Each structure stands twice: as C-alpha cells, then as structure tokens.
C-alpha cells in the first residue's frame, strides 16, 4: 500500500486540467502513442465540444520515481464546474491528495476556490501547480500570492508547469509520490469498498467504480451492497488505464471497477459500501459489520418541466430519462401533467449548466424532441393552518387566501472579478435583489460576497454576469436558508383560460413589469385566429396586464356599393355574432416559442 497514491486534479474551467491529465498519462505510458488523443479522459462528445469535464473518470498509472521505486498512481479526474460539485466531492473522498491547478495567466477563480475548500474539508493534501507557464502573459508571482491570499495554503514551492509543452511534468509526478500520503486502510481486514461512481454499459450492465479501503477482492467472489442488501457475483474486476485492464484481484488502497451483472442502477448507489459474503452462510452474514461513511444525498436546486413535442413519444422520453439517470445520479424526475403540454416530467437539476447538459444529452444521445418550461426553484409555503409545504412547480402554488407566507431559497454567492468590473457587477447584483455581505481585494482581483434569492439566479444571472464583465467574472454559490419574501404567482390567461405551464413566480416589485413583458411577447408569437384572443397576466383575480390579438376578418361590405347604412350594419352584426360564437368553442394553440419567450423576458 505504501506504493499507491490516489490523487485528483482540481481546477477552474479552462485552466488546463484535462490537458495535464493527458500529459501525466502519456508520461507514464498509460496509452500507446497512437491511442493518445486530446482530452483522453473526457469521453462524452459534449464534454469535448464544450471543453468541460462532467463525469469523473479514472486512470491507473505506473510511475518509476527517481528513487528507483515503482509507484501506482490512480488519477481520478474531477469536473470543475460548480454545478457538478457533487461529482467533485465524491472523487475527492476517494483520494488522499489533490493537485490544485491554477492558470498562471489568470490567477485563482471562483470554482477553484470552492473545490479546494471541499478538498481541505475532506482532509486531502493539496499540492499547488501553476499551469500555462508557456504563455507570454503568465505571471507566476501574482498567481502564487493569490493562492496564498484567497485559499490560504502555502504556495512558495508551487510547481511551474505547462501541460501543453510538457514542462514540469516530472516534477509534478515526484511531488505526487513524495508529498501526498499513502492510502490508509487495513489490507488484512474484511473487504470494504466505496462506490465512487457507477454507470450503465449496454453490454455488461452496471459498471461500479470503487475505491477499496480495507481487505481485498478476488474475481468471482460473492459481494453484497451494504445499503440495499443486494448480492451479486463479481464477474469482472480490473482497473482503467484509461482503457479497461482486467485483473484477478483488487487490493486495499486501489481504485478499480467491478462488473457484476447488475441490471438496475438503484442497486449500486453511489456512496454505498461493497463487502463480501461469508462463505457457507447463504448470504446472511457480510464480512464487514459497519459501512463506510457515505456521501450526503444531494438536493436539486433548479426544476423545469420536460415534455415531448409529440404525445406518443412520452414512453421513449421516460426510457431516455431512466438511462440518463443511470449515469447521472443527481438527476431527479417525476411524471407530471400539464393542460397545455400534455404528459411530461418535472426534472430537478443541480444548476443551469446541469439542466442544459441533460437537455442536450437527451436530444443528442436519445434523439428526443423536447419542450422545456421555464426553470423554477423550490419555495416553502406556510399554509393558514401552519403546515409547511414545498412547492417545486409554480402551477401547484396554493391560492393567495390559503397561505400566510412564502419563503424563497437564499444563496450565498461569491463573485470574483478584476477590479475594473466591480461597479458593473454590483449594479447587476443589486438589480437581482442581492444584499452585499463582504468585499475583499486580493491584488487586482476583487471578491464580492452577496446573499441573493436563488430564483433570481436561475434564469439568466450567469449570462449577464459574463456580459457585464466581458467574461472575466466567475461565480459560485451555496444554499444558505429559506427566508420569507413578498413573492407572487403570475398566471397567464388565454381567453380567460389559465395556461399552467406559463405560470411564473416573481417578486411583487417586478410582477407588473414581468407580466406586461410576457404578455406583449406572447402577442407577437401567437398567430392571429378567426376570433379575438385576449392574453392576460393575473395575480390571483387581479388582472395586471392585457393584450388583444385582433381577429382575422373578411370584408363583408365589399359587395355593398351604395345602399342604405342599415344593410351594412346588418352584415357587420351578422359577422360579429358568428365571431362571438366561434370564440366560445374555438381554442388557441400555444406554440413552442411561447414557453421559451418567458425565458427571454429582460429584467
């Protein structure tokens, strides 16, 4: 065990984490030169395109150190984006050390800090690395002082490197071997292995990525999941080098995979402990008595409705979501029915990027055509009888008379930016009802801390933050508490009928404005009918905005040249009566763009 090192790489998006991983794999001969490609650990197309890492991947490498010994290095790649922080904490809990990669030309950014704190909380040894030293504008001294100021770890011997040119790779490998501790665990004890990740493979079923803490696992042994109690045969075990390399056994301290012919992913929950079954007890007794401390269940923060464009596609959307859930344990979904859109699902996501990626994967990998409703957050509603209920969907909000208060989720937001953009960012945060808690200068970087309602962030805060700061600002947020607030539900009515999928929950101060904006946007989108269509925005029974789409009508007076006015009146009255009758039985089709229009209403 003394020759094993488990480590991961922490970095902000685009600071060169995946490229550094490629270099380490290449240097240790993990893949043949011809198999080497850029971002070898990012296996999804969407990861390569967006240049982000979503799923954690692993690689087992052999490194011959300068002291002549051969070490087994297990690299566990982590995502950098704040939406995937759950994947990060899982990856880190399987490691003893982490490389903190900071772009020497940009310095420390928000998500680096968030993930680094996660690592320090888990007691992981952090080794700072300054990447992109080959750039002409690299400023290692500034980056070092930022690491010390913002994160508070000693960066005097941070290793300068360039993942692109290969500079400093050997120094990094030496630091991994000498600075990071060997795994702790009892190699002779009963088997306990933690499931770090699991995903579904169409050929072999569920593949579990495990970190063996105590004991050893031999191919073909009977294993048991401690949380679910399910039992299987470990048919195939091995390690990823990133390619699969089957092994006869996995020892304590190693990170590898188990394939046990599991059909449904619920059986192999991430964070569960795998142990052996004592031979001869018929599966009654497991060898280990207590499970490893798992991970906390993650709560989705953002909810949206996903509906198939064709009602007949409902079943295939359900299958697609089930398959996606196999690879993404943080996705939540449940069926829901909307009068406007038919049958679909209410899905819970960790954040906006997560939502976008799930949507894109559904469309790309499973050929789904989707209608997505506006994202919303979970509100706490206190009823008149004192009962507290959680409302995920605006259309499920009780009537105004039946509740005493609504509490909205408040998050603490950390914003990092160069000091010339502070004014613009502060203005934006104030527009979003943010309350400034703190402001700190670190060299030329400024860190602002705000408390803001999550509902204000989910729509477009991130996009606007990037545009007011020309892309330099970065943010992360964590949930703080629920707080009573004056928020109201705005319903959109078409000819007096509520369209449930268009309801939005907004602060009262913005309700009039938002209502008017949505209504006028809808007027542009809905095509003219044979009868007048009234589009209204209402809070409870009070109408706050209205637009009318005038009817298409034939000129019934075209055939009257001269003649008496009463003749013309009669024809007009007759047309009017027909339109009125049509309006009673006619229905208005709401096009897909109308649901997206809500997302584009500017503040």
UniProtKB/Swiss-Prot annotation:
The UniProt record lists the keyword Cell inner membrane: yes
GO MF term (any one): GTP binding
GO cellular component entries: plasma membrane
Record's keyword annotation contains Secreted: no
Keywords: Cell inner membrane, Cell membrane, GTP-binding, Hydrolase, Membrane, Nucleotide-binding, Protein biosynthesis
Binding residues annotated for GTP, in chain numbering: 14-19, 131-134
Annotated tr-type G domain residues: 2-184
UniProt xrefs under SMART domains: EFG_C
GO BP annotation list: positive regulation of translation
Domain of life: Bacteria
Cysteines paired by S-S bonds: none
Primary localization: membrane
A Pfam family per the record: EFG_C
Compartments (UniProt record): Cell inner membrane
Alphabetized SUPFAM superfamilies for the sequence: EF-G C-terminal domain-like, P-loop containing nucleoside triphosphate hydrolases, Translation proteins
Enzyme Commission identifier(s): 3.6.5.n1
Reaction catalysed by this enzyme: GTP + H2O = GDP + phosphate + H(+)
Membrane-topology descriptor: Peripheral membrane protein
PANTHER family, per database record: TRANSLATION FACTOR GUF1 HOMOLOG, CHLOROPLASTIC (PTHR43512:SF4), TRANSLATION FACTOR GUF1-RELATED (PTHR43512)
Entry's family note: Belongs to the TRAFAC class translation factor GTPase superfamily. Classic translation factor GTPase family. LepA subfamily.
Task of the protein: Required for accurate and efficient protein synthesis under certain stress conditions. May act as a fidelity factor of the translation reaction, by catalyzing a one-codon backward translocation of tRNAs on improperly translocated ribosomes. Back-translocation proceeds from a post-translocation (POST) complex to a pre-translocation (PRE) complex, thus giving elongation factor G a second chance to translocate the tRNAs correctly. Binds to ribosomes in a GTP-dependent manner.
Name the record gives this protein: Elongation factor 4
Source organism per UniProt: Variovorax paradoxus (strain S110)
Highest classification ranks of the organism: Bacteria, Pseudomonadati, Pseudomonadota, Betaproteobacteria, Burkholderiales
Encoding gene (name): lepA
């Amino acid at each position: 065990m003394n020759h094993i090192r488990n480590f991961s790489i922490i970095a902000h998006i685009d600071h060169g984490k995946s490229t550094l991983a490629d270099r380490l794999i290449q240097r240790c001969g993990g893949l043949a030169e011809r198999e080497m490609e850029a971002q070898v650990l990012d296996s999804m197309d969407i990861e390569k395109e967006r240049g982000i890492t979503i799923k954690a991947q692993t690689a087992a490498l052999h490194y011959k150190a300068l002291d002549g010994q051969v070490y087994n290095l297990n690299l566990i790649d982590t995502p950098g984006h704040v939406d995937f922080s759950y994947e990060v904490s899982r990856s880190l809990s399987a490691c003893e050390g982490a490389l903190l990669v900071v772009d020497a030309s940009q310095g420390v950014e928000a998500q680096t800090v968030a993930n680094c704190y996660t690592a320090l909380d888990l007691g992981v040894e952090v080794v700072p690395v300054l990447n992109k030293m080959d750039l002409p504008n690299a400023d290692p001294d500034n980056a070092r002082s930022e690491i010390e100021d913002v994160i508070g770890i000693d960066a005097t011997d941070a290793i300068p490197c360039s993942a692109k040119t290969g500079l400093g790779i050997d120094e990094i490998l030496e630091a991994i071997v000498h600075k990071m501790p060997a795994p702790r665990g009892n190699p002779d004890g009963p088997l306990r292995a933690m499931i770090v990740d699991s995903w579904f493979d169409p050929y072999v079923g569920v593949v579990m990525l495990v970190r063996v803490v105590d004991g050893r696992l031999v191919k073909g042994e009977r294993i048991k999941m401690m949380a679910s109690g399910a039992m299987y045969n470990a048919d195939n075990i091995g390690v990823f080098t990133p390619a699969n390399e089957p092994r006869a056994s996995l020892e304590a301290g190693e990170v590898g995979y188990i394939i046990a012919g599991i059909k449904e992913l619920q059986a192999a929950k991430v964070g569960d402990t795998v142990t052996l079954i004592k031979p001869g007890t018929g599966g009654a007794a497991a060898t280990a008595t207590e499970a490893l401390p798992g991970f906390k269940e993650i709560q989705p923060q953002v909810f949206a409705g996903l509906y198939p464009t064709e009602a007949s596609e409902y079943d295939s959307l359900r299958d697609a979501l089930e398959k996606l859930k196999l690879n993404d344990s943080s996705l939540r979904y449940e069926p829901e029915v909307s009068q406007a859109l038919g049958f679909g699902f209410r899905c819970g996501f960790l954040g906006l990027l997560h939502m976008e990626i799930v949507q894109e994967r559904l469309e790309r990998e499973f050929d789904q055509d989707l209608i997505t409703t506006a994202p919303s957050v979970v509100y706490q509603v206190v009823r008149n009888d004192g009962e507290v209920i959680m409302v995920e969907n605006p259309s499920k909000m009780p009537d105004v008379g039946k509740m005493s208060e609504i509490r909205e989720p408040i998050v603490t937001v950390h914003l990092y930016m160069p000091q010339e953009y502070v004014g613009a960012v502060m203005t934006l945060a104030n527009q979003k009802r943010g309350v400034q808690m703190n402001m700190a200068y670190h060299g030329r970087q400024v860190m602002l801390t705000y408390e803001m309602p999550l509902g204000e962030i989910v729509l477009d805060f991130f996009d606007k933050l990037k545009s007011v700061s020309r892309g330099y600002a970065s943010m992360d947020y964590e949930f703080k508490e629920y707080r009573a607030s004056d928020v109201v539900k705005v319903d959109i009515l078409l000819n007096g009928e509520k369209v449930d999928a268009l309801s939005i929950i907004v602060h009262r101060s913005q309700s009039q404005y938002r209502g008017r904006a949505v209504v006028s946007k809808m007027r542009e989108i809905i095509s003219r009918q044979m009868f007048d269509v009234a589009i209204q925005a209402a809070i409870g029974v009070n109408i706050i905005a209205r637009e009318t789409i005038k009817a298409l009508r034939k000129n019934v007076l075209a055939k009257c040249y001269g003649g008496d006015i009463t003749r013309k009146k009669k024809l007009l009255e007759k047309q009017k009566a027909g339109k009125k009758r049509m309006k009673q039985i006619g229905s208005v089709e709401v096009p897909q763009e109308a649901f997206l229009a809500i997302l584009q209403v500017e503040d």
